[in-house]
């Protein structure tokens, strides 16, 4: 942690096909072993499949899926005295996107379809319709925060 100045966030270049920074970030999260072109191919194939099945615009379905997976609150552990409390805190906008994308990718990896593109497309379509593992994960996080609302005054 620097003492003098706050370090700014690195600017991410928008993806080449749709010119979206959010999609570029998603490709980076999906990428394994630095194979960006493979990750891009998977994402673009998944987006095409989604657009075909839903009849909507590529980015519209992607945005809708992300919106339904973004968490509003989460719990953080806070030690007070001898015990640890799960304190509900609001999630910052950048972290909301990061968590939503990470959960979508994790949920897609656990699915049973043949290719990763098919898994990703199916998970995002489910998320756009408010179902699927990624949405369930968000609901679980919200439920945890709701259950621990009594400890909200321990926020820092």
Swiss-Prot record:
Gene3D superfamilies per record: Ribosomal protein S7 domain
Pfam assignment, any one: Ribosomal_S7
InterPro entries: Ribosomal_uS7, Ribosomal_uS7_bac/org-type, Ribosomal_uS7_CS, Ribosomal_uS7_dom, Ribosomal_uS7_dom_sf
Top-rank taxon, per record: Bacteria
Biological process, per Gene Ontology: ribosomal small subunit assembly; translation
One GO MF term: tRNA binding
Key words of the record: Ribonucleoprotein, Ribosomal protein, RNA-binding, rRNA-binding, tRNA-binding
SUPFAM superfamilies listed in its UniProt record: Ribosomal protein S7
Keyword match Ribosomal protein: yes
GO terms under cellular component: cytosolic small ribosomal subunit; ribosome
Subunit description: Part of the 30S ribosomal subunit. Contacts proteins S9 and S11.
Role of this protein: One of the primary rRNA binding proteins, it binds directly to 16S rRNA where it nucleates assembly of the head domain of the 30S subunit. Is located at the subunit interface close to the decoding center, probably blocks exit of the E-site tRNA.
Family: Belongs to the universal ribosomal protein uS7 family.
Descriptive protein name: Small ribosomal subunit protein uS7
Annotated source species: Vibrio cholerae serotype O1 (strain ATCC 39315 / El Tor Inaba N16961)
């Amino acid at each position: 942690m620097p003492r003098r100045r706050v370090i700014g966030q690195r600017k991410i270049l928008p993806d080449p096909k749709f010119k979206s920074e959010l999609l570029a970030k998603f490709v980076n999260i999906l990428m394994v072993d630095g194979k960006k072109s493979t990750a891009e191919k998977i994402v673009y194939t998944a987006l095409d499949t989604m657009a075909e099945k839903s009849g909507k615009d590529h980015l519209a379905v992607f945005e809708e899926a992300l919106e339904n997976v973004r968490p509003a609150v989460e719990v953080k552990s806070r030690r007070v005295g001898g015990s640890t409390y799960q304190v509900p805190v609001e999630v910052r906008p950048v972290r909301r996107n990061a968590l939503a994308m990470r959960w979508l990718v994790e949920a897609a990896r656990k699915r049973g379809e043949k290719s990763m593109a098919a898994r990703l497309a199916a998970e995002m379509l489910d998320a756009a319709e408010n179902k699927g593992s990624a949405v369930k994960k968000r609901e679980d996080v919200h439920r945890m925060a709701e259950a621990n609302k009594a400890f909200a005054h321990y926020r820092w």
